[in-house]
A protein has these predicted regions:
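Serine-hydrolase catalytic machinery in alpha/beta-hydrolase-like enzymes
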Residues: 13-43, 47-116
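Short, proline-enriched alpha-helix->beta-strand connector loops that line the catalytic pocket
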Residues: 163-168, 195-197
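A domain-start/cap signature at the N-terminus of enzymes
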Residues: 1-51, 96-99, 125-132, 137, ...
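Short alpha-helix in the alpha/beta-hydrolase fold that links the catalytic acid
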Residues: 68, 180-190
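Histidine-bearing beta->alpha loop at or near hydrolase active sites
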Residues: 87, 201-210
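Short beta-strand/loop motif that positions the catalytic acidic residue
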Residues: 169-172, 176
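Primarily recognizes the serine-hydrolase "nucleophile elbow" in alpha/beta-hydrolase
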Residues: 112-114, 120-165
Length: 227
């Protein structure tokens, strides 16, 4: 594991699947081992590569927190991968990119072996701690992720190398008492803007949450964004 310490690069890439894709929600773990969930919409067909959203839960969370996306993924033909962190939080907050990067890479390999994915439509998304991880890991993998979606992030600590410029969507509640809106408004969003990223920043009246209307805006932005 030490060889991957502070290594943010993901190596898995979309390819021609050689295994049959499941349909619906499939667990990637067990009752004793944290894993994640793969959701494949019924309309998926291997001859039509699908968009992919990789969704990262908040601190102490689980993959099932993203079940709210099943319906829009079904509607729009999006494949959803919701991996789970190896510990309570994603490992960027611990000052390294290690076990979580390795697991995420293996989870992506699992998806790419089963699902035909559009390489120009892969988003890394997250809420809270997961949003911070998306904004930290994403800049080093701009050759894989076309978009980054961050709901109520707290920080962005990217590591070299910085590759590509994925488009960025950030939302934050003006009444957030867990991670104040100023973190995004005055820090994270301006930083990405100054670094040359195309960014959409949304504030909403509310707390530390993902209101349905904001999630809809993010998905519409993802699907409508030009490659």
């Amino acid at each position: 594991m030490s060889a991957r310490h502070k290594d943010p690069r993901l190596t898995a890439r979309p390819r021609q699947p050689n295994e049959t894709a499941p349909r619906g929600a499939v667990s990637l773990g067990s009752d004793k081992v944290r894993g994640g969930i793969l959701y494949v919409p019924e309309q998926y067909h291997p001859t039509a590569p699908a968009p992919l959203i990789v969704a990262l839960h908040g601190g102490g969370g689980q993959a099932r927190s993203w079940e709210r996306l099943y319906e829009p993924c079904e509607e729009h033909g999006i494949v959803l991968l919701a991996p789970e962190s190896r510990g309570r939080t994603w490992d960027a907050i611990q000052g390294m990119f290690g076990p979580d990067v390795v697991f995420l890479d293996s989870a992506l390999e699992y998806v790419f072996a089963r699902c035909a994915i559009n390489p120009k439509k892969i988003a890394l998304a997250g809420f809270s701690d997961g949003a911070s991880y998306a904004l930290s890991l994403g800049p080093s993998n701009g050759d894989l992720f076309s978009e980054l979606i961050a709901f109520s992030p707290g920080f962005s600590y990217p590591e070299e190398p910085i590759i590509g410029r994925p488009k960025v969507f950030i939302s934050h509640g003006t009444e957030d008492r867990v991670l104040p809106v100023s973190l995004s408004r005055d820090g994270i969003a301006p930083m990405f803007d100054m670094d040359g990223y195309t960014i959409r920043y949304e504030e909403f009246t509310g707390g530390h949450e993902m209101p349905p209307e904001v999630v809809t805006k993010a998905l519409d932005w993802f699907l409508g964004s030009e490659p």
